[in-house]
Curated annotation (Swiss-Prot):
Transmembrane feature ranges: none
Protein name in UniProt: Transcription factor FUP7
CDD domains associated with the record: GAL4
The keyword Transcription regulation belongs to this UniProt entry's keyword annotation: yes
Function noted in UniProt: Transcription factor; part of the gene cluster that mediates the biosynthesis of the mycotoxin fusaproliferin (FUP) that belongs to the class of bicyclic sesterterpenoids.
This protein's encoding gene: FUP7
Keywords assigned: DNA-binding, Metal-binding, Nucleus, Transcription, Transcription regulation, Zinc
Native source species: Fusarium proliferatum (strain ET1)
Region annotation (Disordered) ranges: 162-216
Compartments, record wording: Nucleus
Listed PANTHER family: HALOTOLERANCE PROTEIN 9-RELATED, TRANSCRIPTION FACTOR PDR1
SUPFAM superfamilies cross-referenced by the UniProt entry: Zn2/Cys6 DNA-binding domain (SSF57701)
Portion annotated as DNA-binding: 10-37
UniProt feature, compositional bias: Polar residues: 199-214
Amino acid sequence: MSPARGRAACKTCRSRKQKCDGIRPACSRCRSLGLQCTWPTVLKRGPPKGYTKALEARLAETELVLIRLLHATNDEGLLARAFDGDTQKRAHKRFGERNTELKSSVIGEHKMLALMDHWERFPLRTADDVRQWIGEVSKTSMMQGEGTNQSNEKTRGLLRVESSSGNADYQHEDEVQSPAGAGDDMAVGDPYRDDSVDQDSIGQPPQRTESVGNMQPACETHAVQDITTSSRIELPADFKDQFLW
């Protein structure tokens, strides 16, 4: 990324009356000479030419219209209605929006020029001028309100689309992860599965089985043990003492 390039020259180049390339934070000349590169403070631009006079003229016209209306109506209730809660809220809201737009130097300058053009096209010198101005302001307010509503509707529509898309993806994922044959009658047969094998016996340790031919009654078993015990040869005592330990 190339360094930022400014319009004004640095203080060092300006004091030496030399050409400055305007590269920030340090220009090429200051870097080559090993000098500290400092820059002048950028001042905010003032209002465009003629804005102050146009603003003063517009303010005078507005005050004159207000005075004429009050003298023509001579209605105390009109002042009360003009300063009720709803009217003051709308006026303060509009004033706050305009004041916020004028805070930025660049946007404020364009806005000031637009206001000067608006004041020139809609003066407040006659009753017809005031009616036209009121109609223009009302139309602009309605267009701004419709634009805000359309923007809000578009945002809500996008949120609904994203929400429905997320639900559809979640449902599709559940369908993919679920087994294909959840029911018993819809299960697909396993070619390696023997239907004669009980599935409950899977995982249980094998049971010890004996053949029928090897099984003997308990009485015969005791008899064989007695015969084996009785058939032992009794050795003499001298032989036991000599050869047995």
